[in-house]
């Protein structure tokens, strides 16, 4: 076999050195990124790969599932909003599963609240909360690992707005303002996971969907997702 000229050997060694440095840097990012904003993700769609390790390119997986830091007082009067939240959260979730848990239970054990609804859902509630996805210190209603997407859900709000998305009473116009504040906070932590990380807001009612868009929820983020009552995936 012919000997490789010295300049070619030097070039090969230089390329190998650069490749090793790049691999080490990539490994360093993989080991140190844990719920930290500021590092850009690389493209990876977990629905198209066979090796779970390849899904590590989605930085949103560095969040965690658990009860939200702010208590959720779930009662009979507002339960549909949380049923819808869990419906949206589980539409494309996996292996994560979002459900109801007992307030204060740190084991994240999902419970069937139908069994306790009659005795526990009278009054102001407060005995149950929901599992959500925490990333960058911000809570999201759900996480779709296969799509590298975090989601927010807005349930029965349509009766507050007319068909144009305007509040039926003046104070009702404050609701979309609060939505935009929440969206802005969520977007700030999702942006650092570009280009893979995505945020979607799902609305059960068309009037609320219109109100959200009027207030500033971007068209590419807002989704009208009707709910078949009683369906929690």
Whereabouts are the PLM-identified features?
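Acidic-basic catalytic patches of nuclease active cores, encompassing PD-(D/E)XK
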Residues: 3-138
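Short secondary-structure boundary/capping elements
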Residues: 134, 178-181
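Active-site or metal-binding loop neighborhoods of secreted/extracellular toxin and effector enzymes
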Residues: 1-22, 180, 184-233
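Alpha-helix initiation/capping motif
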Residues: 70-71, 78, 144, 165-168
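Conserved catalytic cores of phosphodiester-cleaving nucleases, focusing on short active-site segments
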Residues: 140-144, 148-163, 186
């Amino acid at each position: 076999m012919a000997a490789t000229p010295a300049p070619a050997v030097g070039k090969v060694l230089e390329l190998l050195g650069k490749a090793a440095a790049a691999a080490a840097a990539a490994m360093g990012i993989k080991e140190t990124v844990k719920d930290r904003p500021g590092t850009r993700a690389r493209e990876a769609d977990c629905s198209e790969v066979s090796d779970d390790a390849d899904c590590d390119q989605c930085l949103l997986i560095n969040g965690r599932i658990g009860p939200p830091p702010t208590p959720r007082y779930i009662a009979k009067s507002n339960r549909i909003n949380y049923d819808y939240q869990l419906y949206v959260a589980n539409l494309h979730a996996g292996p994560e599963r979002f459900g109801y848990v007992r307030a204060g239970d740190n084991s994240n054990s999902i419970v069937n609240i139908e069994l306790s609804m009659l005795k526990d859902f009278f009054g102001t509630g407060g005995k149950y909360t929901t599992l959500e996805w925490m990333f960058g210190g911000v809570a999201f209603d759900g996480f779709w690992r296969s799509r590298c997407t975090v989601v927010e859900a807005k349930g029965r709000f349509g009766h507050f707005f007319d068909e144009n998305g305007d509040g039926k009473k003046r104070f009702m116009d404050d609701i979309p303002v609060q939505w935009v504040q929440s969206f802005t906070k969520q977007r700030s932590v999702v942006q650092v996971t570009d280009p893979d990380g995505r945020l979607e807001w799902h609305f059960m009612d068309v009037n609320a969907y219109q109100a959200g868009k009027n207030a500033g929820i971007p068209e590419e983020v807002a989704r009208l997702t009707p709910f078949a009552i009683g369906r929690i995936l």
